[in-house]
Regions:
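Conserved GNAT acetyl-CoA-binding A-motif
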Residues: 143-152
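Conserved acetyl-CoA-binding loop-helix of GNAT-fold acetyltransferases
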Residues: 118-119, 125-139, 158-166
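GNAT-family acyltransferases
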Residues: 1-122, 185-210
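Short, contiguous, well-ordered secondary-structure segments
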Residues: 100, 105, 129-139, 155, ...
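A short coil/beta-turn micro-motif at the C-terminal edge
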Residues: 24, 155-157
Length: 210
């Protein structure tokens, strides 16, 4: 039993940007984004190594896995979504445009986690990923009282490097053979932010309010 001070589901909002759990109603939108942008995602997507022997992974499998980890307070698997009706008529069901996940949460003396993210390229370049990650960071350092967050990025993924630089994450060397990506074990550049180094609110910083 962890000492995690949250109960899933957790929903975060900053204007039209909403982090919420994926649901069954999101399956068609999720699969459409992934299929339409398969070439875009392929160089960055984690893949099961041959020794894993994993069967095809369905959307329902993903939901079950996410919900299990979240209920055990080991992950915060959010959909990055957009509210088309904000602010005059907030939507009851916001549009999926990507994902921001807090993974591998460790409690006790570590109080650490890793963050990963992706976005539909049709929505890229609007500052939505930095804002979504900032919302997640503020929640982790504020509500959860985590101490250390890590983001690991392939060296050639320039847009992702710009995200962490904008948010103030600091380089922390190379994680050798960290993830199996597109069929190969790949090194990643590591970036770290601790609660001691972070501003009171990354969302406020991005919004020009701090």
């Amino acid at each position: 039993m962890s000492d995690a001070p949250f109960r899933w589901p957790v929903v975060l909002r900053n204007g039209a940007v909403v982090l919420r759990p994926f649901g069954r109603d999101d399956e068609a939108a999720y699969l459409e984004i992934r299929a339409r942008n398969q070439a875009w995602f392929k160089p960055w997507d984690a893949t099961p190594p041959p020794e894993a022997g994993r069967e095809p992974y369905s959307y329902a499998d993903m939901l079950r896995n996410q919900q299990g980890l979240a209920k055990e307070c080991r992950a915060l698997p959010w959909a990055l979504t957009w509210d088309d009706g904000w602010p005059s008529r907030p939507a009851r069901h916001t549009r999926v445009i990507g994902s921001v996940g807090v993974n591998g949460i460790v409690w006790g003396s570590s109080r650490s986690a890793a963050i990963g993210y992706w976005i539909d390229p049709a929505w890229a370049g609007r500052g939505l990923v930095p804002m979504g990650v900032a919302m997640a960071v503020d929640y982790c350092f504020g509500r959860l009282q985590l101490h250390r967050l890590e983001i690991d990025i392939l060296h050639e993924n320039s847009p992702s490097h710009r995200v962490v630089e904008k948010l103030g994450f600091k380089p922390d060397g190379t994680r050798r053979s960290l993830l199996h990506i597109n069929g190969v074990w790949r090194d990643h550049d590591a970036y770290i932010l601790t609660a001691d180094e972070a501003p009171v609110s990354l969302v406020a910083k991005l919004s020009g309010l701090a």
